[in-house]
């Protein structure tokens, strides 16, 4: 059995390690210039909207960086402009809600089945069957609130509406009619 080499050798017999050593040498000699000689007026910031997006295993967080900068500026300015409602700067959407909706619909479909019908996997709704709309308001009392609505027709006479608010509570209601 052949031993594995830790570095890949190219056709020219340069290993990855050797190439990295060649690149690192000039990088170590680089120094950071003194930025005090530059004036702030020379630097132009782009006008595009900057949004930070990151996620962990439970939540997806979308943060509006421009709104955060505007909020910092409004705190430092006099209270004349403080009456304006700040922009929403944080929206949190939990991917666990998809699983909760799917589990609820699975229970609902199993409870509505007639005893003579066979239970197959084709009747279980997939998360793609949901229409998902996210709404948020910019008023100060609803800062960061996210509303998620899902509609799915289970049968001809039943439909489910699921509403969740990102701030405090979740409501689950079923309409049969």
Curated annotation (Swiss-Prot):
Q: Does the keyword Nucleus apply?
A: yes
Q: In which compartments does the protein localize?
A: Nucleus
Q: Region Disordered: which residues?
A: 71-90
Report the protein's function.
Answer: Involved in meiotic chromosome segregation.
Q: Where is the composition biased (Basic and acidic residues)?
A: 74-86
Q: What is the lineage of its organism?
A: Eukaryota, Fungi, Dikarya, Ascomycota, Taphrinomycotina
Membrane-spanning segments: none
**Any one GO cellular component localisation term in the record:** nuclear envelope
- The answer to whether the entry has keyword Oxidoreductase is no
- Record's keyword terms, sorted: Nucleus
Predominant place of localization: nucleus
Protein name, per record: Meiotic chromosome segregation protein C17A2.07c
């Amino acid at each position: 059995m052949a031993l594995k080499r830790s570095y890949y050798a190219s056709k020219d017999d340069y290993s990855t390690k050797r190439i990295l050593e060649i690149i690192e040498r000039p990088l170590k000699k680089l120094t950071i210039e003194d930025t005090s000689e530059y004036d702030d007026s020379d630097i132009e910031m782009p006008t595009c909207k900057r949004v930070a997006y990151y996620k962990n295993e439970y939540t997806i967080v979308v943060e509006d960086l421009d709104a955060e900068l505007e909020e910092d500026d409004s705190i430092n300015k006099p209270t004349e402009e403080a009456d304006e409602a700040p922009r929403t700067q944080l929206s949190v959407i939990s991917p666990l809600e998809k699983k909760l909706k799917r589990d609820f619909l699975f229970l609902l479909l199993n409870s509505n089945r007639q005893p003579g019908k066979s239970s197959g996997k084709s009747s279980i709704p997939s998360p793609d069957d949901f229409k998902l709309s996210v709404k948020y308001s910019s008023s100060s009392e609803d800062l960061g609130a996210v509303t998620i609505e899902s509609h799915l027709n289970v049968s001809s006479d039943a439909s489910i509406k699921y509403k969740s608010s990102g701030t405090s509570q979740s409501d689950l209601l079923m309409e049969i009619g």
